[in-house]
Amino acid sequence: MKAYKLLRIKNGKLYPLFIHRKFETPMNIWMRAECYPTKGFAVRKGWHCCFIPYAPHLNMVLSNGEQRVWAECEIKEWDTYNRPESQGGAWILAQKIKIIRTLQMEEVEKMLLKYA
């Protein structure tokens, strides 16, 4: 199934936002979720993704210069996890993920117009 994941981009490489954040996330390779308990975060094993590239509670560019990018992914073995609309609604917790490509912001904006 197709899903969308928000990642950090640094020196042209992709990394998770918060959990296991130093892990370089390769493209076009199936990866299995592992559990990395992290202080300040609930333990939810799985790659956190969205049905659409929408996470209104997260900024795309941080004051420290960190930049984020949406990626189109393929996922397997997934469940949904309900969150408030202020956090984008239902999240996906996938046990397997393959990052297909990154999206340009214009592409994201066009996709979101379909769901507005």
Predicted regions and their residues:
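ADP-ribose/NAD+-binding catalytic cleft of ART/PARP-like enzymes
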Residues: 1-44, 60-68, 75, 79
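Generic "edge-of-domain/loop-turn" microfeature
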Residues: 11, 54, 78-80, 99, ...
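Intrinsically disordered, low-complexity, compositionally biased regions/tails
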Residues: 16, 50, 92-93
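Catalytic toxin/effector domains delivered as secreted proteins or via bacterial secretion systems
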Residues: 41-49, 53-57
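Generic detector of well-ordered alpha-helical segments enriched in charged/polar residues
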Residues: 56-59, 109
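Charge-dense polyanion-binding interfaces
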Residues: 62-100
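Active-site or metal-binding loop neighborhoods of secreted/extracellular toxin and effector enzymes
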Residues: 92-116
